[in-house]
Amino acid sequence: MFGIHSLAGVLLLVIVQSQLASPLQEAEDNSSLETADSLLEDLRGVPNMKRQSEGTFSNYYSKYQEERMARDFLHWLMNSKRSGAPSKRHADGTYTSDVSTYLQDQAAKDFVSWLKSGPARRESAEESMNGPMSRRHVDGSFTSDVNKVLDSLAAKEYLLWVMTSKTSGKSNKRQEDH
């Protein structure tokens, strides 16, 4: 308890002394306030200069990085040329790939055109070499012959059905009419 009372007394003493000293310092503070304001304005201008200098530094640093990257690239190019090892460029690989794709497409087109027009040429070439040969199913002769036979059978059955149904239908109608 005694410690708290002594602490409160010391604080009261400090406050009273500061209150008595403040009227004396007011006269001195007016002149110091003017200098403090001018110092604050000067300090406010400093961060702008720092920002500008930071921007200048960043600009110079990025230019330095670009120059360094260009220099490193040139050194790499010169070293790769000096090594004498055959190097495959990306453009060469792309060209080779494009040519391969084109040739594959062209081969596919040639094969399809050969399939479309090939049997007649192949048949005449085979006949001249080996004599007459029977046509294969791939050539389409068997399929077309079977289709012709089936069409003629279907036509005969249809005609037979029509003839039988008309005669029975006519006779029924005639019987109903009479």
Curated annotation (Swiss-Prot):
Gene Ontology molecular function: glucagon receptor binding; hormone activity
Annotated GO biological process: response to starvation
Alphabetized Gene3D superfamilies for the sequence: 6.10.250.590
Pfam families in the record: Hormone_2
Function, as annotated: Promotes hydrolysis of glycogen and lipids, and raises the blood sugar level.
PANTHER family the UniProt entry points to: GLUCAGON, PRO-GLUCAGON
Protein's name according to its UniProt entry: Glucagon-2
Organism: Oncorhynchus mykiss (Rainbow trout)
Phylogenetic lineage: Eukaryota, Metazoa, Chordata, Craniata, Vertebrata
Gene name of the encoded protein: gcg2
